[in-house]
């Protein structure tokens, strides 16, 4: 089997080139870079963290520490992690662009541990990177859990799998070929 080359361009000095844990793994891990939050997003995150602390009966001391944090403290926190609250989606940058070979597509799948332990997975279930796309690969990561999660900068957030595709030409017809199954749909083949 011919081994194709996946060209990868780092768009950010801290970006990680995708890696495989084992030579025969299908997926290459994608790594998180910091999100550049707007001032409103930063304010929203602070308020959500305070609300969570209140709901969890945080002590007055804990709340004082939260509110006493300086802008510099918050900037350091935002540079080190990506805050993803329950049932929210965040576009997580990877800092890389890829040149998927013609005749292939890049599929962005969940990492099993992140999905099963923390409820984090691509919002679109499977992200697609077409062979002619050359901008930054980002992961629309959704938190399906009821707990907030902080993604560390440099954390593995998804996996990229390169798969062959068949480029069929769509043609409108008046009739389709008959098959034994016909129009029998969901559940028609039994349990």
Language model features with spans:
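DUTPase catalytic domain/fold
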Residues: 1-191
């Amino acid at each position: 089997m011919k081994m194709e080359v996946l060209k990868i361009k780092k768009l950010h000095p801290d970006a990680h080139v995708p890696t495989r844990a084992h030579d025969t793994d299908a997926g290459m891990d994608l790594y998180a870079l910091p999100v550049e939050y707007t001032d409103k997003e930063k304010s929203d995150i602070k308020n959500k963290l305070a609300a969570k602390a209140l709901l969890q009966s945080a002590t007055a001391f804990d709340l004082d520490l939260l509110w006493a944090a300086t802008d510099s403290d918050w900037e350091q926190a935002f540079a080190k992690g990506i805050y993803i609250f329950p049932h929210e989606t965040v576009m997580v940058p990877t800092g890389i662009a890829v040149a998927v070979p013609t005749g292939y597509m890049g599929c962005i799948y969940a990492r099993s541990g992140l999905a099963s332990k923390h409820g984090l997975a691509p919002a679109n279930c499977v992200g697609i990177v077409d062979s002619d796309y050359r901008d930054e690969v980002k992961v629309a990561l959704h938190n399906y859990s009821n707990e907030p999660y902080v993604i560390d900068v440099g954390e593995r957030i998804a996996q990229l799998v390169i798969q062959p595709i068949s480029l069929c030409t769509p043609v409108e017809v008046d009739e389709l070929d008959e098959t034994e199954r016909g129009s029998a749909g969901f559940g028609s083949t039994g349990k």
